[in-house]
Amino acid sequence: MKILVINVSLRPQSREKLFPIGLGYITTAMKNAGFVFDVLDIDAYRHSDQEVESFLRNNKYDIICIGCMVTGYKIVKTLSLLIKEFYPETIIIVGNSVATSIVNTLLTYTKVDIAVMGEGDETIVDLLETIHQGKPLDNVRGICFVKEGKMVSTAARPLIRDISKLPCIDFSIFDVDLYIQNSKISVSDPLPIPRDEVRALPVNTARGCVANCDFCYHVFKGVPYRYRTPGSIVGEIKSLIGKYSLNYINFWDELTLFSKKQNLELVQKILDDDLRFYWTGNCRANLFNSEDDIPIIEK
């Protein structure tokens, strides 16, 4: 099978080029399962609409996978129309929140064939293997598709409980040097080092959030908060620093720091392994509510 993975650009006018960490996990799972695929990284290279159209017209694929937030619905719709105009038989698979949150709209008003619901690491591999073997989709957990004019939702796929066992992202699937060079733009002020010296990549420490805020939606909303072990997190950081000479780590999670106990364990593991790096991460404002908590962060 000839497979293409597309990373869309939600903010083409922005100087920031943020590594697609969700798509990074998906493509890593695909690669580890033995699938060979191309990547069209529209966001990294800021390909124009004309360039994207030309690429899709001149390159035929059996399957095209698109990962996108719900705010990119219009982009996904446009891409699906283009793909089907050129190659009607190409199977279009879409994941992330644009699939999970508005699946009825997605499958009704676009040319998308299959929506991956929720966590996609295992689903995408199962789905691709099923398509490759010519088997019916009904037994693939965690997807929605249209069959004989009716929408079919398969059984939900169980959550990956121990996310520490997930393989770390293979950043080499994408243009990692481009993302590292651009990382200096996305790191927030105030900076502890000159901006031009920043070399950063993201690390995912958790999936989900302990809160259930009305204004927020993400793929892991409504499911248990899962946090990687300190050893797993630090092991990935150590590997990335050694491989890419990083001095900054972006903890890109819905919620990175959720308890003082967790924070102390992670800090201690970093100190035990003698790692030194700068970092950014997300936490609830009420987590650190006294001056006694500041030393945890300073460490």
Where do the PLM segments sit?
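N-terminal [4Fe-4S]-dependent radical SAM core
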Residues: 4, 9-11, 140, 146-202
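Radical SAM [4Fe-4S] cluster-binding motif and immediate context
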Residues: 171-299
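Glycine- and acidic-residue-enriched helix-capping/strand-helix junction motifs
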Residues: 12-23
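Conserved beta-strand positions
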Residues: 5, 66, 94, 117, ...
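Glycine-rich beta-alpha loop elements in corrinoid/cobalamin-binding modules
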Residues: 29-162
